[in-house]
């Protein structure tokens, strides 16, 4: 299996911009034969959002994750994307695995580093 890593610098607070960049990366990776594209932590929201991260966080069953599923399906490539997840009145540093066919799989980071990550 060919795996592509997208080492992007996410634009803090601009999810639409970050999704557009991820879309182009998925197209490029798929055209190169990759079956999985991986992104860094918080690829959707970006680091540095500060207190705005709570407002930017998205649910695992929300529109942003569904958009990732559409990108995956259109390009025939699975995506592993870091994002700030809101659930149960809390924010999690999570990763979504989408393949365009099945329900997204969500992993919540459990070994948090430093005060910032523990405050999520």
Which residue ranges define each predicted feature?
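A short, hydrophobic beta-strand-centered structural micro-motif
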Residues: 61-87
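Alpha-helix N-cap and loop-to-helix initiation/capping positions
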Residues: 13, 17, 21, 55-63, ...
């Amino acid at each position: 299996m060919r795996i592509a890593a997208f080492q992007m610098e996410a634009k803090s607070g601009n999810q639409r911009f970050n999704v557009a960049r991820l879309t182009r990366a998925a197209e490029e990776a798929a055209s190169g034969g990759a079956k999985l594209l991986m992104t860094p932590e918080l690829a959707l929201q970006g680091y540095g959002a500060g207190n705005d991260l709570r407002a930017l966080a998205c649910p695992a069953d929300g529109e942003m994750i569904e958009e990732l599923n559409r990108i995956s399906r259109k390009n025939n490539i699975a995506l592993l994307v870091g994002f700030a997840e809101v659930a149960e009145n809390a924010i999690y540093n999570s990763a979504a695995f989408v393949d365009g066919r099945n329900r997204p799989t969500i992993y919540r980071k459990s070994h948090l580093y430093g005060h910032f990550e523990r405050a999520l």
